[in-house]
């Protein structure tokens, strides 16, 4: 186990998460008692208590007053906020994790973009207008791409879509900085944003589904060609 956290709390959090991931503390089992665990990790009980509360909020653990702390099956109890942690824990699965992330984005965006165009076209156009001023480099495009999908999600009038995109932000933008280093990817994205703006202006809601699906397919092809050169910083390092 290699832990790169700098603070005691960060170290304790990584130690426990990696122990759950590696089945040292398997799902469904009980964590060691607080005193034993704090000595094992080398942190104070106060620090450990704070870490356990945070891990419980993220779905890794279940804490019940007067009962031992239980290790959860995090696939069933955690949310999108653990995506970056999963990427750090299992480097070999990062490409599949990102494929799944982008597939979800495409599937739900066909719904919320169409709804945004139908119900709040002015707001949607305002979101898409940012594409007219983006600088031609990877960081700017990664930020723009995230803000456009997030903005259109909230413009749909259903904030749950926006919260889902929020939950993807860390891994999404890290992936975007690598993907948009490719000029072909930036060109494809600009064409997509401009096409969406045109559809919104024309009220052509029925064409949104096919436009988004096509972009998902074409951008996916570029991404798959780039996967063999994934940078190490796609996974979060310790705190």
From Swiss-Prot:
Residue ranges flagged as DNA-binding region: 34-53
Span of domain HTH gntR-type: 6-74
Gene Ontology terms for molecular function: DNA binding; DNA-binding transcription factor activity; fatty-acyl-CoA binding
Cross-referenced InterPro entries: FA-response_TF_FadR, FadR_C, TF_FadR/GntR_C, Tscrpt_reg_HTH_GntR, WH-like_DNA-bd_sf, WH_DNA-bd_sf
One GO term describing the cellular component: cytoplasm
Annotated Pfam families: FadR_C (PF07840), GntR (PF00392)
One BP annotation, GO: fatty acid metabolic process
Highest taxon above the source species: Bacteria
PROSITE patterns the UniProt entry points to: HTH_GNTR
Subcellular location per the Swiss-Prot or TrEMBL entry: Cytoplasm
Keyword DNA-binding: yes
Keywords: Activator, Cytoplasm, DNA-binding, Fatty acid metabolism, Lipid metabolism, Repressor, Transcription, Transcription regulation
Matches recorded under HAMAP family: HTH_FadR (MF_00696)
Oligomer and partners: Homodimer.
Classification via NCBIfam families: fadR_gamma (TIGR02812), PRK04984.1 (NF003444)
Function: Multifunctional regulator of fatty acid metabolism.
Record protein name field: Fatty acid metabolism regulator protein
Gene name of the encoded protein: fadR
